[in-house]
Amino acid sequence: MKAKKTKRPRPKMPHASEEMKQWSAMLGNELSAWPQVKTRPMFGLRGFYRGRKIFAALPVTRAINNPNSLIFRIKPMPPGLLERAKKEPRIDTENRVPGAKWFLFELNSTADLRDALWWLNQAYDHAK
C-alpha cells in the first residue's frame, strides 16, 4: 500500500475582474519594457521573468485568491522591506500564496497602480 502524499491546498483562482484585466494590461505593458523581461502564460496569469527568474504574475483570465490581485516574488525579502510590506494593508504577508515566496497585492482602484508598480519594481530588482 502506498503512503498518501500530503498536498498543499491549492490557492483559489477566481476569474479576474474586468477592471483587473485592464490594470494588468497596463502594468504588463510597463513591465515588458524593462530590460531582460520575458513573459510566459501560466494558469490564466502571465508570468514575468527577469532572465530565468520569475518575479511577478499578473491576471489574464484568472487571479489568485481575489479577483483584483496580482502576485510578486521577493526571495528572500530583506527585513526592512518585509516590515514595509507588513504595514501595507493591500499586501497579504500572513497568507503568502502560493507558498512563502509569493506576496499578494490587492488593487482597489487606479490609484493603487503606482504602489503596485513600486512593489513590482522591488521584485524585479531582487530577481537578479
Enumerate the predicted regions with their spans.
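N-terminal first-folded block
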Residues: 15-54
